Amino acid sequence: MSLLTEVETPIRNEWGCRCNDSSDPLVAAASIIGILHLILWILDRLFFKCIYRRLEYGLKRGPSTEGVPESMREEYRQKQQSAVDVDDGHFVNIELE
């Protein structure tokens, strides 16, 4: 005897969703939130390179130099460059023959 004959199968009208005719505001809010979440997730997956690249490089620009005299800007650049030059000593140069 087959297992399929032993399993009860639901009748046709039990397959439908029972919450369609419900006017509960909680159900409506959950549906709206679910749809918005799905839309945002799809947009995130489509444009994640643009979004995260902008966030990553947008935060690394450094302080604004607006309104700062050019001499002070140059001094700041030299300090930043000297800090980078000091860090270069920690790396090992490997020369290939």
Swiss-Prot record:
Organism: Influenza A virus (strain A/Swine/29/1937 H1N1)
Glycan attachment sites: 20
Chain positions of site Seems to be involved in pH gating: 41
Reported regulation of activity: The M2 protein from most influenza A strains is inhibited by amantadine and rimantadine, resulting in viral uncoating incapacity. Emergence of amantadine-resistant variants is usually rapid.
Subunit structure and binding partners: Homotetramer; composed of two disulfide-linked dimers held together by non-covalent interactions. May interact with matrix protein 1.
Site (Essential for channel activity, possibly by being protonated during channel activation, and by forming the channel gate and the selective filter): 37
Chain ranges passing through the membrane: 23-43
Protein's UniProt keywords contain Ion transport: yes
Family note: Belongs to the influenza viruses matrix protein M2 family.
Name of the protein described by the UniProt record: Matrix protein 2
HAMAP family in the record: INFV_M2 (MF_04069)
Keyword Ligase included in the entry's annotation: no
Role: Forms a proton-selective ion channel that is necessary for the efficient release of the viral genome during virus entry. After attaching to the cell surface, the virion enters the cell by endocytosis. Acidification of the endosome triggers M2 ion channel activity.
